Amino acid sequence: AVLFCLTLLPACGKDTANTKVATKVTLNEVAHSIFYAPMYVAIENGYFAEEGIDLTLVTGFGADKTMTALLTGEADIGFMGSESTIYTYVGGNEDYAVNFAQLTQRAGNFVVSRTPIDNFSFDMLIGKNVLGGRPGGMPEMVFEYILLKNNIDPSQDLSIDQSIDFGSTAAAFSGGQGDFTIEFEPHATALEEKGDGFVVASLGEASGYVPYTAFSAKKSYIKEHPDTIQAFTNALQKGMDYTSS
């Protein structure tokens, strides 16, 4: 009996020592939208937990706010337009943000009109007032890129209102501002359901492939936690594989 107990004790101790404690990671997302479905699938299907990550998801409501959370340490990882990391580098931040994984490669927003338009073309925006995005943000830059592709000068041929906070443009449009608005889901569908607007074009279809939304972390975090960065990417890939299957 004594021999049996001695045999079991080391085994029990070994199991306890090998039990891994999940790494806590705070992720700040730029917005909460079905556009980012693979990430939510990875969360709901437990892929982050499988990779040893205890994930907390926070919505920043704008890339500027998400990047601020990342740089101040409120978030470990930020999910936003890839342009934001360039701004931190150019701005001279010593511990700048670095993109390490990409989720979306097209614009995920839509042109919403006040009336149905069966055969929309971007030249219909000439002379109109459009509720756009934050200056220098990926949604606004891609929208202007599309306009230029269609020989439309964003600064001369139409009026783009960039004064409204991200996430508030749909409410402003419902309140009577603008002839068109550029909206992500679920706001585009919500406008249609209320009868306040009609989706007439997909910016993702018009833009082609672009490095639209990516995950980033501070340079120091990536250096100090390479295993966490890889585990996070693994979980994300599982979510992408699931949604594409």
Predicted regions, residues:
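Short, catalytically relevant binding-site loops at active-site mouths
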Residues: 187-188, 205-207, 221-222, 239
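C-terminal motif of bacterial Sec signal peptides marking the signal peptidase cleavage site
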Residues: 7-11
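Short, glycine-/small- and polar/acidic-enriched structural segments
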Residues: 19-165, 172, 179-186, 196, ...
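Extended ligand-binding regions for polar small-molecule ligands
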Residues: 14, 45-50, 215-245
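Basic/polar N-terminal segments that are highly enriched at the extreme N-terminus
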Residues: 12-20
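Sec-dependent N-terminal signal peptides
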Residues: 1-3
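Short helix- or helix-capping micro-motifs
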Residues: 191
